[in-house]
Amino acid sequence: MGTLTVNQNKLQKRLRRLAGEAVTDFNMIEDGDKVMVCLSGGKDSYTMLDVLMHLQKVAPIKFEIVAVNMDQKQPGFPEHVLPAYLKELGIEYHIVEKDTYSVVKELIPEGKTTCSLCSRLRRGTLYTFADEIGATKMALGHHRDDIVETFFLNMFFNGSLKAMPPKLRADDGRNVVIRPLAYCNEKDIQAYSDFKQFPIIPCNLCGSQENLQRQVVKEMLQDWERKTPGRTESIFRSLQNVIPSQLADRNLFDFTSLKIDETAASRFVNVVNL
């Protein structure tokens, strides 16, 4: 593509800076790492790969990048798109072929949400492949808005305070998942994808289903953001500023042992001047 406009240049610098800060803050990538970048063909994973390739050039450490896409044998999946794009970039890549589509269609009744099962099957396959190629980190393209949405989904439907951590050791103990776009917002990623003209591959399984719980939460947050700009960022910051003593989880704070501090100095309160 040609020379970037002033706004495009600012956007690119902002995404690179925020991704770099997230990588540094959470020690996502270390010297000698082999980072498996999971590509779905969507705007988020393309942007993540683009940003990580830049960081690889400028970072004070050395690390490998291996791009991996999983062909789940969805009808109409354009198999040629990602190989052509990745060959042009000149980076190592693998296409993992596994027919999870048939499994999902067999197990999930028509009209029901397939996202959860599809995601679990894909994740398990990618964990196994990461182990096979000796990847030390597995990079996913989730961004700030995904993290906040997940926080509310868990609160509303699971009764738990958890989201998507920027860095996570998988349950198998053999994979470390990183989310380099954790500080980046979806609006910026969409704008970046538009001007970079990434060859987007739509998700035919889950993208066509209406009224998913995540979509409802997304629309709620978008409505809040329209009414009060900056609210999503404030919510995200709250996930980095947890105060266990002000919540009600007895596993995080010892409420049972909480007593008056007999050594504390007395404090005189002038009730007249209150």
UniProtKB/Swiss-Prot annotation:
Q: Alphabetically, which GO biological process terms does the record hold?
A: tRNA thio-modification
Q: How is the cofactor bound?
A: Binds 1 [4Fe-4S] cluster per subunit. The cluster is chelated by three Cys residues, the fourth Fe has a free coordination site that may bind a sulfur atom transferred from the persulfide of IscS.
Q: Which HAMAP family match?
A: TtcA
Query: What protein am I looking at?
Result: tRNA-cytidine(32) 2-sulfurtransferase
Which reactions is this enzyme annotated as catalysing? Answer: cytidine(32) in tRNA + S-sulfanyl-L-cysteinyl-[cysteine desulfurase] + AH2 + ATP = 2-thiocytidine(32) in tRNA + L-cysteinyl-[cysteine desulfurase] + A + AMP + diphosphate + H(+)
**Which molecular-function annotations from GO does this UniProt entry contain?**
4 iron, 4 sulfur cluster binding; ATP binding; magnesium ion binding; sulfurtransferase activity; tRNA binding
Q: What is the stated purpose of this protein?
A: Catalyzes the ATP-dependent 2-thiolation of cytidine in position 32 of tRNA, to form 2-thiocytidine (s(2)C32). The sulfur atoms are provided by the cysteine/cysteine desulfurase (IscS) system.
Q: Where in the cell is it found?
A: Cytoplasm
Any idea of its EC number?
2.8.1.-
Q: Which residues form a coiled coil?
A: none
What the entry lists under InterPro entries is as follows: Rossmann-like_a/b/a_fold, TilS/TtcA_N, tRNA_Cyd_32_2_STrfase, tRNA_thiolation_TtcA_Ctu1
Subunit structure as annotated in this protein's UniProt entry: Homodimer.
Task: Enumerate the UniProt keywords alphabetically.
Answer: 4Fe-4S, ATP-binding, Cytoplasm, Iron, Iron-sulfur, Magnesium, Metal-binding, Nucleotide-binding, RNA-binding, Transferase, tRNA processing, tRNA-binding
Which pathway does the protein contribute to?
Answer: tRNA modification
